[in-house]
From Swiss-Prot:
It is found in: Cytoplasm; Nucleus; Nucleus, Nucleolus. Its cofactor is Mg(2+). Induction: Strongly down-regulated by DNA damage-inducing agents. Pfam families: MMR_HSR1, YchF-GTPase_C. Expressed in all tissues tested but its expression is more abundant in testis, liver, lung, and brain. Overexpressed in several malignancies, including cancers of the colon, rectum, ovary, lung, stomach, and uterus. InterPro entries: ATPase_YchF/OLA1, Beta-grasp_dom_sf, G_OBG, GTP-bd, P-loop_NTPase, TGS, TGS-like, TGS-like_dom_sf. CDD domains: TGS_YchF_OLA1 (cd04867), YchF (cd01900). PANTHER family: OBG GTPASE FAMILY, OBG-LIKE ATPASE 1. GO terms for molecular function: ATP binding; ATP hydrolysis activity; cadherin binding; GTP binding; metal ion binding; ribosomal large subunit binding. This is Obg-like ATPase 1. Keywords: Acetylation, ATP-binding, Cytoplasm, Hydrolase, Magnesium, Metal-binding, Nucleotide-binding, Nucleus.
Length: 396
């Protein structure tokens, strides 16, 4: 397996992209690297996975529950009538080929499907199999990763020119002062993407005004990536593959801070065909485990999403929010009245609840907190909101 990521000193990227919690992550890669097989095992669905470059033409989309031991514990504790976990929306996108930005293969459709996603599972193949053709004729994951990066980069470069031309016509030659700041920002984007040949997300100092402009255009290279390396079952179990270190070195150099996660589509497929008991025996015998929980959590985090819990005998539920969400807006996820009439958030940390054993014990230990409207909700908070009910207009 690749060495553990250092990167403690890397500044986190700014949050660029659509604002909301119904965000999607797309599975992107060359044809026949295992995208549809991965999508099938991830979502337990049956998208066609034939050995054919364009067997996924329309993107298949599915919701995948986010595995979480905290959620499972709360469900075991409360034994609620209703259990609702957080979900990750995953899209399987047609295989890209070299020249996609010029419409090669299913290039334009492929790139528009990526544009509709908010993050990317960049899947690359590091297994040999004579029965599964490779569109480039040989297995070389570094080359494949570079092809994808180049296509996304070239598509962004192609988009930037017309945007600047239009703004120049109105803001510079037409003298529209309101649009001049946007023109200046797009010139900065052009310098970074076209002149310096760097993806949008690699610049970590975009300010709020610049991000506002970037969000109007949703450039492909602004989307966060998680790199998934598809290994043979044998290589995954023995934790060895000649490409892994090279891939990790490439990512650390060209996409610092991004995660590289090895997995085996063949193993995951086999595990799904076994009964729960057989699966457990097989994993123990081979001293291995499924990579899917780690992959799902990494995709969710890459979209800058997290969740808080509401928990009781009626329902245990994970409510998805963007990182940095304040208490009133988090309350609004449950009901708009909660946000409008927000009084306070009564907050327990999951760790405190588990350690103390009950809500009353958390209160007795002085760990039950009352938070106001400036409180930034943290991942895994257990919250009870207090709010004023809006007055109904009197009937005449």
């Amino acid at each position: 397996m690749p060495p553990k990521k250092g990167g403690d000193g890397i500044k986190p990227p700014p949050i660029i992209g659509r604002f909301g919690t119904s965000l999607k992550i797309g599975i992107v890669g060359l044809p026949n690297v295992g995208k549809s097989t991965f999508f099938n095992v991830l979502t337990n669905s049956q998208a066609s996975a034939e050995n054919f470059p364009f067997c996924t033409i329309d993107p298949n989309e599915s919701r995948v529950p986010v595995p979480d031991e905290r959620f499972d514990f709360l469900c075991q504790y409360h034994k609620p009538a209703s259990k609702i976990p957080a979900f990750l929306n995953v899209v399987d996108i047609a295989g890209l080929v070299k020249g996609a930005h010029n419409g090669q293969g299913l290039g334009n459709a492929f790139l528009s499907h990526i544009s509709a996603c908010d993050g990317i599972f960049h899947l690359t193949r590091a297994f040999e199999d004579d029965d599964i053709t490779h569109v480039e004729g040989s297995v070389d994951p570094i080359r494949d990763i570079e092809i994808i990066h180049e296509e996304l980069q070239l598509k962004d470069e192609e988009m930037i020119g017309p945007i600047i031309d239009k703004l120049e016509k109105v803001a510079v030659r037409g003298g529209d002062k309101k649009l001049k700041p946007e023109y200046d920002i797009m010139c900065k984007v052009k310098s970074w993407v076209i002149d310096q040949k760097k993806p949008v997300r690699f610049y970590h100092d975009w300010n709020d005004k610049e991000i506002e402009v970037l969000n109007k255009h949703l450039f492909l290279t602004s989307k966060p990536m998680v790199y998934l390396v598809n290994l043979s079952e044998k290589d995954y179990i023995r934790k060895k593959n000649k490409w892994l270190i090279k891939i990790k070195e490439w990512v650390d150099k060209y996409d610092p801070g991004a995660l590289v996660i090895p997995f085996s589509g063949a193993l995951e497929l086999k595990l799904q065909e076994l009964s729960a008991e057989e699966r457990q025996k097989y994993l123990e015998a081979n001293m291995t485990q499924s990579a899917l929980p780690k992959i799902i959590k990494a995709g969710f985090a890459a979209l800058q999403l997290e969740y808080f819990f509401t928990a009781g005998p009626d329902e245990v539920r994970a409510w998805t929010i963007r990182k940095g969400t304040k208490a009133p807006q988090a309350a609004g996820k449950i009901h708009t009245d909660f946000e409008k009439g927000f009084i306070m958030a009564e907050v327990m940390k999951y760790e405190d609840f588990k350690e103390e054993g009950s809500e009353n014990a958390v209160k007795a230990a002085g760990k039950y907190r009352q938070q106001g409207r400036n409180y930034i909700v943290e991942d895994g908070d257990i919250i009870f909101f207090k709010f004023n009910t809006p007055q109904q207009p009197k009937k005449k």
